[in-house]
Structures are given as C-alpha cells and as structure tokens.
C-alpha cells in the first residue's frame, strides 16, 4: 500500500537546519527497506514557521523543518513507523496518510499533485528535459 508521511522536525542548530531531518528520514527509510518496503520519494519542503507555538518533550518550538516521504509498505510497518515517530524527540508532529491508487499506480505526492503533476514519471521527464 502507498503511504505519504508528512513530518515536522525540530531545528536545534540554526547553521545546519537540515541535519536532523536528514538523519530522521534516513532512519525511517532504513526501517521501511528492512521490512520489505520501498521509498518512492522524499520531498524536502524547507524551514517554515509553525502556526502556533508547539510543545514536545518540554521544549517549545516556533519553527520546524518540513519534509514529505512517499513510500510503499504493509500496514504493520506503517503503524511501526508511526510508533517510532511518536517516541522520537526530534519529531514535533507527524502524520501518515494512505494514498488512493484506484486508477493510477504511478502516483505523485500530494505536494506535486497540487502543482499539476499527476505522476512521478512526469516529474522525472521534466527534470531530464531541463538538463
């Protein structure tokens, strides 16, 4: 089944804001691959201010590094990933959404679909033509 993970990662070092998000996404990716899953795409969305001050583990956060991950896995692995994310102190908020694959197997992430791209193949062809 295809899932989409949206994560908000804390920023501890202003000089290297991507560091913890990169470590977290590689940890989650390894967990998916070890359990016979496939990571389709990781979309870094950059640093954004949060709509309100959020608390996690007695820390207050007003901005976070956002990322989106598109992956295939079983339902058991998906719930294990969510459990791991809830325990991780680097994660401020996370959400996993099941992507509907009724008519199309090559599905882009919700972020890319909002920009008008319908499949990952369209994104790859666009990147290839720009080179």
UniProtKB/Swiss-Prot annotation:
It is found in: Mitochondrion. CDD domains: bS6_mito (cd15465). GO terms for cellular component: mitochondrial inner membrane; mitochondrial small ribosomal subunit; mitochondrion. The keyword Transferase does not apply. GO terms for biological process: mitochondrial translation. One of its GO terms (molecular function) is small ribosomal subunit rRNA binding. InterPro entries: Ribosomal_bS6, Ribosomal_bS6_sf, Transl_elong_EF1B/ribsomal_bS6. It comes from the Eukaryota. The keyword Translocase does not apply. Keywords: Mitochondrion, Ribonucleoprotein, Ribosomal protein. Pfam families: Ribosomal_S6. Component of the mitochondrial ribosome (mitoribosome), a dedicated translation machinery responsible for the synthesis of mitochondrial genome-encoded proteins, including at least some of the essential transmembrane subunits of the mitochondrial respiratory chain. The mitoribosomes are attached to the mitochondrial inner membrane and translation products are cotranslationally integrated into the membrane. Component of the mitochondrial small ribosomal subunit (mt-SSU). Mature yeast 74S mitochondrial ribosomes consist of a small (37S) and a large (54S) subunit. The 37S small subunit contains a 15S ribosomal RNA (15S mt-rRNA) and 34 different proteins. The 54S large subunit contains a 21S rRNA (21S mt-rRNA) and 46 different proteins. Belongs to the bacterial ribosomal protein bS6 family. This is Small ribosomal subunit protein bS6m. It comes from Saccharomyces cerevisiae (strain ATCC 204508 / S288c) (Baker's yeast).
């Amino acid at each position: 089944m295809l899932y989409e993970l949206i994560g908000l990662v804390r920023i501890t070092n202003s000089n290297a804001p991507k560091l913890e998000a990169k470590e977290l996404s590689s940890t989650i990716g390894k967990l998916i691959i070890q359990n016979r899953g496939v990571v389709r795409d990781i979309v870094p969305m950059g640093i954004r201010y949060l709509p309100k001050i959020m608390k996690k583990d007695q820390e207050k956060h007003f901005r976070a590094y956002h990322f989106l991950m598109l992956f295939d896995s079983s339902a058991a692995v998906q719930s294990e990933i969510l459990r791991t994310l809830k325990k991780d102190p680097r994660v401020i908020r996370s959400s996993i959404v099941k992507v509907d694959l009724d008519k199309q197997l090559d599905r882009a992430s919700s972020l890319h679909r909002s920009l008008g791209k319908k499949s990952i193949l369209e994104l790859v062809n666009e990147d290839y033509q720009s080179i």
